[in-house]
From Swiss-Prot:
GO molecular function: heme binding; metal ion binding
Protein's recorded name: Cytochrome c-type biogenesis protein CcmE
A cellular component annotation (GO) from this entry: plasma membrane
Compartments, record wording: Cell inner membrane
Membrane topology according to the record: Single-pass type II membrane protein
UniProt-annotated binding residues for heme: 124, 128
Signal peptide: none
Pfam families xrefs: CcmE
Spans through the membrane: 9-29
Amino acid sequence: MNPKRKQRLIIVSFLVIGVSATVGLIMAALSSNVNHFYNPTEVAQGAAPVDKSIRVGGMVVDGSVSRDGQSLAVAFTVTDYNSNVDVKYTGILPDLFREGQGIVATGKLDAQGVFQAEEVLAKHDEKYMPPEVQRALDKAQDAAPAQTY
């Protein structure tokens, strides 16, 4: 192999290694900031990781909201009409938050199976539903046995 070809091969090799290292670092940085979405059924089945930042979404169960009169602590239950997840949140809830409405909460699942929310987002209006919540609700309704009233 002549010296010029050898020099080009070394340069190309270093470039490939450098680009690979850069892509690897970018992927590692992005993966630590990704919050995966889970519906209440997946959380109840144990598919959601404990003590890792995730998103949980569904409908707020009617009659489930309880507020602490001494602080901003709120507890409520989220459902996908198949399973329920208890959520605790301390902070100011969005103006559009109410029972029977869709929400997406970001936080961590504790060892007792209670979702400790750090952020709660409510849907924008009566027609809007976050896409991941809508898919989760549709999936849960398809899987649920038919109910007769």
